Amino acid sequence: MASAKKNKDINHNSLVAIKPITDNQKVVFDTWKKGKNQFLFGAAGPGKTFISIYLAMQAVMDLKAKPEKVILVRSLIPTREIGFLPVDEEDKAALYQVPYQNMVQFMFEMPNEQSFSNRYDRLKGQGTLYFLSTSFLRGLTFDNAIIIVDECQNINFHELDTIITRVGQDSRIMFCGDFDQTDLQKTNEKNGLHDFLRILGEMEEFNCTEFTIGDIVRSGFVRSYLINKIKLGIGME
């Protein structure tokens, strides 16, 4: 296993060292190192998805660790029923992968500009990274993998239940989401994530971290906007 990881074009040698910026990020780094699965939720902009992908990449590129691949899972809302579109699955999902393409570029040392622009595709090509829609998970088992479920506020309880029961041997899972950014319309679907969090909160295998406005690292502009949005009570359900 170590030899296979070492011989991949993109490996641990090019992964940059990234340290936590906020206290809550440090909690995630520390509990992940102790073997905990993660449920990260709260304000937009604290780096939930970024640090999840980084920690996952760090794990799968560790020559001594058993996980061999990162699997990004996301619901393709508002087009959940993407099977009706006359294109293949990769084309349908391409738009939803743009944020991850941007993120992974900053996790690795780049010898040239071309390497910077195609890093995501090369990780997929060498079998280190996969992207899957929630529509295509039933019946699968993920062994030797780190599963990252992003934008999980757009996934109902039934789908969350399906996803977490895909976790196989020598695998771990991370959930990232923001209750305030859900695209789900029905109350019972929105409540599904809250119920799911209650279950994970009882599991010793999980660390659940809520990020607040004070954790925002995207920009001071975003922090100011959210502070005033909350102060005025606008867009709050």
Predicted regions and their residues:
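Conserved RecA-like ASCE ATPase "motif II neighborhood" in helicase/translocase motors
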Residues: K124-T162
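Interdomain "pre-motor" coupling segment immediately N-terminal to P-loop NTPase/helicase cores
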Residues: M1-K8
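Conserved P-loop
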Residues: F39-A43, F50-R119, L184-E202
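Pre-Walker A adenine-sensing motif
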Residues: A17-G35
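Conserved nucleotide-binding/hydrolysis micro-motifs of P-loop NTPases
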Residues: G45-P46, S75-R80, L137-R138, N154, ...
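Pre-Walker A (Motif I) flank of P-loop NTPase domains
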Residues: K34-L40, N144
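Structural recognition of the conserved hydrophobic beta-strand(s) that form the central parallel beta-sheet
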Residues: L72, F131, I148, R172-D178
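Conserved coupling/interface region of RecA-like P-loop/ASCE motor cores
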Residues: F196-E237
